[in-house]
C-alpha cells in the first residue's frame, strides 16, 4: 500500500470510520445480519463489492454477534477476465471464498443481438447461479454491493420510465423464495467508496469486459443526480431521506392508504391539507451530519 502523509492517513481513517458507521447503521436499521449468520458476499471485482467485503470483515472482528463470511465470485468466461486476480487477493487476506465458473457469456451473446445491452439477461442468469451457490454453501444471507447512489438512480429510473415510486430495498427475499438478500452499502456514498478503493488499492476488474452497451437511461440518471449534487449541495441527501420518510396518506396509491373510507368524522390525518397554507419547507436542506469528533448537529447547506 502507498506511503501516506499524516494528513492523508487521518483523512483515510475518517473515511473508514464513516463507511463503518454507515454499514453498521444499515445492518442495525434493517436487521441485516443476525447471530450465527453465514453471509455470502458477492464479489464482482468492482470497487463496491471489494469495499463491502473489507468493511464487513472489519466489523466482524468487533461485532457483538458472531457471523461468518464467505466471498463468492462468478467467473462468467468473459473475454479478458483475469481469473487469477481474485483468488490471489482473497488468499492474501485469508478469507473463505469460492470461484464459480459458468459460461453465461456465450449464452448472452447467442440470445442478444450485437450492439444491444446484455445486462438484463446477464443479471437474471447471474442471480440464478448465485442463489444456487448460496444453497450449496449453506449461506443464510446474500450480500450485494449496491450503494446509496444506485438506490437513488433506480428511484429516478422507475419514476421517469416506469411510472412507479420504487427503488431498491435494503433487504428482501430472493426471487426463488429461499434466501434473504441484503445491501449493507445502502447508506454509503459512491464517492466515499471510490476514495476507499483508491486508498486500499483493490485489484479492480473492469465491468465492461462483456462489451455490452452501457444502460443509457441509468447513465442519464447518474449524470443528472451528479449535476444536482454539484449545483445544489445537500439535495441528494434530502432525496434519500425522503424515501425513508413516507406519508402514504399524502400520495395517491389507494393500495397503500384507504382513501375510500375517509369521511368527515375521520379526523385530521397526518397534518391534513396544506394546499391553502404557506409550505413549511426550509429554504435550504437541513441534514444530520456526523462531525469528526462524533458530535451530531444540524447544519444548513448553502
From Swiss-Prot:
CDD domains: TtcA-like. The gene is ttcA. This is tRNA-cytidine(32) 2-sulfurtransferase. Homodimer. GO terms for molecular function: 4 iron, 4 sulfur cluster binding; ATP binding; magnesium ion binding; sulfurtransferase activity; tRNA binding. The thiolation reaction likely consists of two steps: a first activation step by ATP to form an adenylated intermediate of the target base of tRNA, and a second nucleophilic substitution step of the sulfur (S) atom supplied by the hydrosulfide attached to the Fe-S cluster. It catalyses: cytidine(32) in tRNA + S-sulfanyl-L-cysteinyl-[cysteine desulfurase] + AH2 + ATP = 2-thiocytidine(32) in tRNA + L-cysteinyl-[cysteine desulfurase] + A + AMP + diphosphate + H(+). Its cofactor is Mg(2+); [4Fe-4S] cluster. GO terms for biological process: tRNA thio-modification. Catalyzes the ATP-dependent 2-thiolation of cytidine in position 32 of tRNA, to form 2-thiocytidine (s(2)C32). The sulfur atoms are provided by the cysteine/cysteine desulfurase (IscS) system. Keywords: 4Fe-4S, ATP-binding, Cytoplasm, Iron, Iron-sulfur, Magnesium, Metal-binding, Nucleotide-binding, RNA-binding, Transferase, tRNA processing, tRNA-binding. It is found in: Cytoplasm. InterPro entries: Rossmann-like_a/b/a_fold, TilS/TtcA_N, tRNA_Cyd_32_2_STrfase, tRNA_thiolation_TtcA_Ctu1. Binds 1 [4Fe-4S] cluster per subunit. The cluster is chelated by three Cys residues, the fourth Fe has a free coordination site that may bind a sulfur atom transferred from the persulfide of IscS. Pathway: tRNA modification. Its EC number is 2.8.1.-.
Amino acid at each position: 500500500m502507498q506511503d501516506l502523509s499524516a494528513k492523508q492517513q487521518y483523512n483515510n481513517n475518517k473515511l473508514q470510520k464513516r463507511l463503518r458507521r454507515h454499514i453498521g447503521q444499515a445492518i442495525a436499521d434493517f436487521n441485516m445480519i443476525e447471530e450465527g449468520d453465514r453471509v455470502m458476499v458477492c464479489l464482482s471485482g468492482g470497487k463496491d463489492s471489494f469495499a463491502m467485503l473489507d468493511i464487513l470483515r472489519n466489523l466482524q472482528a468487533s461485532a457483538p454477534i458472531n457471523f461468518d463470511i464467505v466471498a463468492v465470485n462468478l467467473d462468467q468466461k468473459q473475454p479478458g477476465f483475469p481469473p487469477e486476480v481474485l483468488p490471489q487477493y482473497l488468499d492474501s487476506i485469508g478469507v473463505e471464498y469460492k470461484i464459480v465458473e459458468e459460461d453465461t457469456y456465450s449464452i448472452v451473446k447467442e440470445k442478444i443481438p450485437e450492439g444491444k445491452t446484455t445486462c438484463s439477461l446477464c443479471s437474471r442468469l447471474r442471480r440464478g447461479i448465485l442463489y444456487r451457490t448460496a444453497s450449496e454453501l449453506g449461506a443464510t444471507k446474500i450480500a450485494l454491493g449496491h450503494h446509496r447512489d444506485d438506490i437513488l438512480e433506480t428511484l429516478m429510473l422507475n419514476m421517469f420510465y416506469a411510472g412507479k415510486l420504487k427503488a431498491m430495498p435494503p433487504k428482501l427475499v430472493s426471487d426463488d423464495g429461499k434466501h434473504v438478500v441484503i445491501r449493507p452499502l445502502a447508506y454509503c456514498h459512491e464517492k466515499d467508496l471510490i476514495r476507499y478503493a483508491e486508498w486500499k488499492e483493490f485489484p479492480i476488474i473492469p465491468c465492461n469486459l462483456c462489451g455490452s452497451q452501457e444502460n443509457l437511461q441509468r447513465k442519464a440518471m447518474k449524470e443528472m443526480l451528479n449535476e444536482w449534487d454539484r449545483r445544489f449541495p445537500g439535495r441528494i441527501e434530502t432525496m434519500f431521506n425522503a424515501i425513508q420518510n413516507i406519508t402514504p396518506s399524502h400520495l395517491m396509491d389507494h393500495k397503500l392508504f384507504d382513501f375510500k373510507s375517509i369521511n368527515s368524522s375521520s379526523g385530521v390525518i397526518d397534518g391534513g391539507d396544506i394546499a391553502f397554507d404557506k409550505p413549511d419547507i426550509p429554504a435550504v436542506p437541513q441534514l444530520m451530519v456526523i462531525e469528526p469528533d462524533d458530535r451530531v448537529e444540524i447544519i444548513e447547506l448553502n
